[in-house]
Every structure is written in structure tokens, then in C-alpha cells.
Regions:
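Exported/periplasmic ABC-transporter solute-binding proteins
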Residues: 22-98, 102-294
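Positively charged n-region of N-terminal signal peptides that target proteins for export
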Residues: 1-5, 9
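C-terminal motif of bacterial Sec signal peptides marking the signal peptidase cleavage site
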Residues: 16-20
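Hydrophobic helical h-region of N-terminal Sec-dependent signal peptides
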Residues: 10-15
Length: 294
């Protein structure tokens, strides 16, 4: 199946009419005939007419986005319930394949076998992966080759990179994490990393790096606060502007994977994707620090 951008929703979604009655338990995906929705357009004439439920599971990196979208969407459509669980990208896609959820959230591109199973790759936003350092680190810029060397265990002390004589503590996510998968794939070091700590959430990585001298880790750009330093990569800062311009090499899609075409889904699920493509939905995406796909 071809990669789809949510902003380019198939024409069938618009003609199918989201005016609608209750939602079914079907799952969703983008269609093959792409047609862009007009900004802010909605085909649901009365918000109170839409009802039903939407279930999501998957990436912990997408927690802020999923929660923000669920909250704002339920305010717009009070008779729709949106639930989200944060089980990791691979688990989320497995859940949508199994039919136990409507949407599988993945913070990486879908694998070929996942697409072959019928999952559509609906990209709703772009995220930058920031390299985070402990606050005392004097090294503030890293090259791609240096990152590879650090994570493969070849460079072991910050003094080798012009910093203080401090051992490098390599922190990462657990196997199955979308962030880890995206990071290792972007650097082409899958299954070659030597981790001192493998943690099960974005928050845990940031907390570990913030409290550990010499630590380095990776996390979603939107999760970075003032407890850690976000390193520049090859002189390019980790900002939304640089990522959207294609100048920052550690970036990835945020995917809401679904089974079948969007036009085949429940009215509630179709309305959610239309909402994400609207001006209102794009504002929600921006507010959590992500980049829209338009």
C-alpha cells in the first residue's frame, strides 16, 4: 500500500458524508484516490449527530498528541468517546491488525510486512528526534558519524569529542520502541547499539539523562524540557523549522495506522481524520510541538 498523508484524504471520504449516525467498530485507512480537504472544512453538519467510540493504542512518543487530539475532538463531538493506550509502536500496529483497536499509533514508518497485512500508513504529523545530554555537558554539537560511534560503543569518553574527561553513558529505549527503531534506522545501526540503559518511556529517558553525568539519550522533540540539553546535529538545531525544511537529519513520521480505507470506516473514525486535516486539528498538532504535514 502506498504511503498516505492524512491531509490528502481520499475523495470518497468527503462524498461518503460524515453526517452521521452511530459509529461502527470498523477500522480506518487512507484511500487510493487522493483529494485534499479544504482547510477547516467539515462534512458533519451537526456535531451532536455524531456518536460512537474510537480506540487507539501504540507509541508512547505520541502520548501528548493522542491525548490532545482526543480531548479536543471529544469537546467538538461530545457523544464520541476516544480512548488511547500507550503500549509502544509495534504493539499498537499489532493491535490494529488484530482488530482490537481502531487506530494503531506508530512513531516510525510502517514495515513492509505491516503494510502487507493491510495496515495503511496515515501520517498525521512529523516529529524530530532530539539528542539529549545532561545539563553539565560542554559538548553541544554532534555529527552523524560521532553519534554512530557513540551508540556502537566505539567512542566512550566525552574527552574524545572535545569535552570533559567523563565516561559516556548511552541511554536508549527498549526493543520495540518506535523511537528506538526510527533512531537506529536513521543512523543505520539497527542491532548494533551498546546501551547502558534501555528504558520503557520517553519520560524515563529524559529523567535518566538529566540525572546522570555524561549521559546521552534520544527523545521526541516535543518532550524536551529545561532539565536536559538538546544537542545540535552537524550545526543544525533541533527545531520545527529546521525539521520541516529538511535540514535536520533525525526526524520521523507520526503514523495513525488503520485497516482498510478511511471511506470504509465508522463515521466517528472518519470524522477524526477529517478533523486532523482541518485548521482546528492542525492547531492541536502544533500546540504539542509537532509539525503538520501540509
Amino acid at each position: 500500500m502506498k504511503k498516505k498523508i492524512v491531509a490528502m484524504i481520499c475523495a470518497a471520504v468527503m462524498t461518503a458524508g460524515l453526517v452521521a449516525c452511530g459509529s461502527g467498530e470498523d477500522t480506518a485507512a487512507t484511500g487510493s484516490g487522493a483529494a485534499a480537504l479544504e482547510d477547516g472544512e467539515t462534512s458533519t453538519s451537526d456535531n451532536t449527530e455524531l456518536s460512537g467510540s474510537i480506540s487507539m493504542a501504540g507509541s508512547t512518543s505520541m502520548e501528548k498528541l493522542a491525548n490532545a487530539v482526543a480531548e479536543s475532538f471529544m469537546e467538538k463531538y461530545p457523544d464520541v468517546t476516544v480512548t488511547a493506550e500507550f503500549t509502544g509502536s509495534s504493539a499498537g500496529i499489532e493491535s490494529v491488525i488484530a482488530g482490537s483497536v481502531d487506530i494503531g499509533n506508530s512513531s516510525r514508518a510502517l514495515k513492509e510486512e505491516e503494510k502487507a497485512a493491510g495496515v495503511a500508513e496515515n501520517i498525521v504529523a512529523i516529529d524530530g528526534i532530539a539528542m539529549v545530554l545532561d545539563p553539565a555537558n560542554t559538548v553541544t554539537d554532534l555529527t552523524k558519524d560521532q553519534l554512530i560511534s557513540i551508540y556502537k560503543g566505539e567512542t566512550r569518553n566525552w574527552s574524545e569529542l572535545g569535552g570533559s574527561d567523563t565516561p559516556i553513558v548511552v541511554v536508549g529505549r527498549e526493543a520495540g520502541s518506535g523511537t528506538r527503531g526510527a533512531f537506529e534506522e536513521l543512523l543505520e545501526i539497527k542491532d548494533q547499539c551498546v546501551y547502558a540503559s534501555e528504558l520503557d518511556s520517553t519520560g524515563a529517558v529524559i529523567a535518566k539523562v538529566a540525572s546522570t553525568p555524561g549521559a546521552i539519550g534520544y527523545a521526541s522533540l516535543d518532550a524536551i524540557g529545561d532539565t536536559v540539553i538538546a544537542a545540535s546535529l552537524e550545526g543544525v538545531e533541533a527545531t520545527s523549522e529546521n525539521i520541516k525544511a529538511g535540514n535536520y537529519f533525525l526526524s520521523r513520521p507520526f503514523v495513525m495506522g488503520t485497516m482498510g480505507e478511511i471511506s470504509e470506516q465508522s463515521d466517528a473514525v472518519k470524522a477524526l481524520f477529517e478533523y486532523l486535516a482541518s485548521d482546528e486539528g492542525k492547531e492541536v498538532i502544533k500546540k504539542v510541538g509537532l509539525i503538520t504535514v501540509d
